[in-house]
UniProtKB/Swiss-Prot annotation:
GO CC terms: blood microparticle; haptoglobin-hemoglobin complex; hemoglobin complex
Organism of provenance: Lyroderma lyra
Residue numbers carrying Phosphoserine: 3, 35, 49, 102, 124, 131, 138
Modified residues (N6-acetyllysine): 16
Binding site for O2: 58
Protein name in UniProt: Hemoglobin subunit alpha
Domain Globin: 1-141
Gene Ontology annotations of biological process type: hydrogen peroxide catabolic process
Residues the record lists as N6-succinyllysine modifications: 7, 11, 16, 40
Name of the coding gene: HBA
Length: 141
């Protein structure tokens, strides 16, 4: 459960992200594909090369979903219900991949929000991304 301080930290970090959420989402995907090559199996139809239009488009979806989640911190299950259904029932993504995605998203945010990426912000973002992952895997049960 995110505390009031966690929510404030997450909102402040995403305020610094601004309109770059899609770019950061694409960068995080590239990091994930390089760091965890098995994640590529979910994207056999994508051009996974650096700067690929498909990776950029999917990165925008990831970034937009996270921005939406930040706007609904008090109702993450409601905000992410459709994505949870998609990943559980249609795409059948292995739940461990959400932890991998969280890891590379944290790294990407740390790079771009450097000055504001304090230990407290890091902890809050980690809790937020873990909460998002929990919601996205909730339909697997």
């Amino acid at each position: 459960v995110l505390s009031a301080a966690d929510k404030a930290n997450v909102k402040a970090a995403f305020d610094k992200v601004g309109g770059q959420a899609g770019d950061y989402g694409a960068e995080a995907l590239e990091r994930m594909f390089l760091s965890f090559p098995t994640t590529k199996t979910y994207f056999p139809h994508f051009d996974l090369s650096h700067g690929s239009a498909q990776v950029k488009a999917h990165g925008k979806k990831v970034g937009d979903a996270l921005v939406n989640a930040v706007g609904h911190l008090d109702d993450l299950p409601g905000a992410l219900s459709a994505l949870s259904d998609l990943h559980a029932y249609k795409l059948r993504v292995d739940p461990v991949n959400f932890k991998l995605a969280s890891n590379v998203l944290l790294v990407t945010l740390a790079v771009h929000v450097a000055a504001g990426f304090t230990p407290a912000v890091h902890a809050s973002l980690d809790k937020f991304l873990a909460s998002v992952g929990t919601v996205l895997t909730s339909k697997y049960r």
